[in-house]
Amino acid sequence: MTRKQKRLAVIGSGMGFLALAAALTFYALGQQTSYFYMPSDLLSQPAAAQERIRLGGLVQQGSVERGQGTHVSFVVADGQNGVPVVYDGILPDLFREEQGVVIEGRMGPDGVFVADTVLAKHDETYMPREVADRLKKDGLWQEQ
């Protein structure tokens, strides 16, 4: 092998390695992507079966029901529609009715959202941006 051929082989191997690393990175990021829905969006355009999504809105007044252990069910609403949610885990301290939440999980075949992560708003003025934008658009939330 000549010097030029060795150099081309090293450069080609390096580029192949970088392409493989980039492909694996994009594949891993694609697996972690979760699309954001409001309850009305989810009911009008259902997510694909077992697709991981984020659902945002307000916890509907009077909908929180605590079951055995850490099992809890509630409804996330956007003022027009609500989606029933079940969650088995410890809820954030700031979780309560009529407060903004973003939950992650999958839509079950029975129309109940099965959450594996619940995120509650941080303080009195915080609202997740996607939720606030949608509620403002629908005229259901005023920024203070």
Curated annotation (Swiss-Prot):
Segments on the Periplasmic side according to the record's topology features: 29-144
Where does it live in the cell?
Cell inner membrane
Chain coiled-coil ranges: none
A single BP term in Gene Ontology = cytochrome complex assembly
Q: Which InterPro entries match?
A: CcmE (IPR004329), CcmE-like_sf (IPR036127), NA-bd_OB-fold (IPR012340)
Q: Name one GO molecular function term.
A: metal ion binding
Q: Which Pfam families match?
A: CcmE
Gene Ontology CC: one annotated term: plasma membrane
The answer, when asked if Chaperone is one of the entry's keywords, is no
Topology feature Cytoplasmic, residues = 1-7
- What SUPFAM superfamilies does UniProt report for this protein, alphabetically? Heme chaperone CcmE (SSF82093)
Keywords, A to Z, come to: Cell inner membrane, Cell membrane, Cytochrome c-type biogenesis, Heme, Iron, Membrane, Metal-binding, Signal-anchor, Transmembrane, Transmembrane helix
Q: Where does heme bind?
A: 122, 126
| The protein's role, per its UniProt record | Heme chaperone required for the biogenesis of c-type cytochromes. Transiently binds heme delivered by CcmC and transfers the heme to apo-cytochromes in a process facilitated by CcmF and CcmH.
Question: What PANTHER family would the database entry show?
Answer: CYTOCHROME C-TYPE BIOGENESIS PROTEIN CCME HOMOLOG, MITOCHONDRIAL
UniProt record similarity statement:
Belongs to the CcmE/CycJ family.
* Annotated NCBIfam families: PRK13254.1-1 (NF009727), PRK13254.1-5 (NF009731)
Its recorded name reads Cytochrome c-type biogenesis protein CcmE
Q: Which organism is it from?
A: Chelativorans sp. (strain BNC1)
Its lineage opens with:
Bacteria, Pseudomonadati, Pseudomonadota, Alphaproteobacteria, Hyphomicrobiales
